[in-house]
From Swiss-Prot:
Record's signal peptide: none
Name the UniProt record assigns to this protein: Autophagy protein 5
Region Disordered, residue ranges: 1-59
Function: Involved in cytoplasm to vacuole transport (Cvt) and autophagic vesicle formation. Autophagy is essential for maintenance of amino acid levels and protein synthesis under nitrogen starvation. Required for selective autophagic degradation of the nucleus (nucleophagy). Also required for mitophagy, which eliminates defective or superfluous mitochondria in order to fulfill cellular energy requirements and prevent excess ROS production.
Locations listed in the record: Preautophagosomal structure membrane
Residues joined by cross-link Glycyl lysine isopeptide (Lys-Gly) (interchain with G-Cter in ATG12): K162
Compositional bias per record (Pro residues), positions renumbered to this chain: 20-29
An MF annotation (GO) of this entry: Atg8-family ligase activity
Modification(s) after translation: Conjugated to ATG12; which is essential for autophagy.
Entry's family note: Belongs to the ATG5 family.
This protein's UniProt keywords: Autophagy, Isopeptide bond, Membrane, Protein transport, Transport, Ubl conjugation
């Protein structure tokens, strides 16, 4: 595991060098923990079924703030370790979207890379911010590109949207009822970091005519690693817990994070009020245990609709 990562704000103006793309948007001033903490009150009461949500009465909405967060990257190829491709990418985006630029940057004699690696670990096609939460690298994140699994990230994204829609409603009629143009526009908005375009389409997914049944929740639990020898868990691996969690309790009270963690992972989370043995982070920030799950989903889920929490031992 890499050394503890620094906050995005620590590198508001990442170094630039060969291969740098256009200047990246500045990192927002507030730490990402601040918008997440507002979810406890701002999103505690979801809108009535069928009513689209408006942005909360804050200077900058929580989702818009999260879409502005970016990660500085320092990318090299094994054959050119001293020729870095330096850029940054939004936390909600995907590394594979950089591959066309990296391929154009590398000499033609080098086979086109297809995968990204962190300390020898091939990275999965997950949102960049989730990868940072999992591996906690020092920033800028030093990655290598090489041959490996070819990513079809657009298809992966849309499959995730369909799965999240099914979990929310018990069916995927919301996304399946959209036109091809709309689903393409949804992915293009993520690809282009176009928050307004994404939000317009996503509002239709989050506000069906009936109340949602479950929150699309995935909890990522990193392993301690063991190098993989003798059957030990390979370094950098993690397991994913996914279960059906209703947005409200049997008493119709909004379901909050703390009791959910205690019920699903009682060994790691013996208390429903405070982190004792472990915490969870989302978009680089600890999440208040009092935050309602539906509020977290509406305000801080990744663009495919999944609320992805990473367990961090204390």
């Amino acid at each position: 595991m890499a050394s503890p990562r620094r906050s995005e704000a620590d590198l508001a103006s990442p170094a630039r060098g060969p291969g740098s793309g256009p200047p990246s948007p500045p990192h927002p001033g507030p730490d990402s923990a601040r918008p997440l903490s507002r979810i406890t009150s701002a999103a505690a009461s979801p809108p009535p079924p069928g009513q689209r949500t408006a942005e909360p009465p804050t200077t900058i909405s929580i989702p818009r703030t999260l879409w502005r967060l970016s990660i500085p990257l320092y990318i090299t190829h094994p054959s050119l370790p001293n020729t870095p491709f330096i850029t940054s990418l939004p936390r909600v985006s995907y590394l594979s979207l950089l591959l066309p630029r990296i391929r154009a940057f590398l000499p033609p004699s080098i086979p086109a890379p297809t995968s990204f690696h962190h300390e020898g670990i091939a990275l999965r096609a997950l949102p960049l911010g989730l990868l940072v939460d999992l591996y906690q690298p020092t920033l800028p994140w030093r990655l290598t590109v090489d041959q490996g699994d070819d990513w079809h990230v657009g298809d992966t994204f849309l499959n995730g949207v369909k799965e999240a829609d099914f979990v929310r409603n018990g069916h995927a009629k919301q996304i399946m009822g959209m036109s091809k143009a709309d689903t393409t526009a949804l992915w293009n908005a993520v690809r282009d970091a176009d928050y307004p375009a994404w939000a317009r389409i996503n509002a239709r997914l989050l506000n069906p005519s009936t109340p949602i049944k479950h929150v699309p929740l995935r909890i990522y639990i990193p392993s301690s690693g063991g190098g993989g020898a003798g059957g030990a868990t390979p370094a950098g691996s993690f397991r994913v817990m996914q279960t059906l969690v209703p947005p409200r309790t049997a008493n119709r009270i909004p379901q909050t994070l703390g009791p959910t963690l205690r019920d699903l992972l009682p060994v790691l989370f013996p208390s429903s009020r405070d982190p004792v043995l472990a915490n969870v982070v989302l978009h680089g920030a600890p999440v208040p245990f009092s935050a309602p799950l539906e509020g977290l989903m509406r305000e801080a889920a990744y663009p495919d609709g999944w609320l992805c929490l990473t367990v961090v031992p204390l």
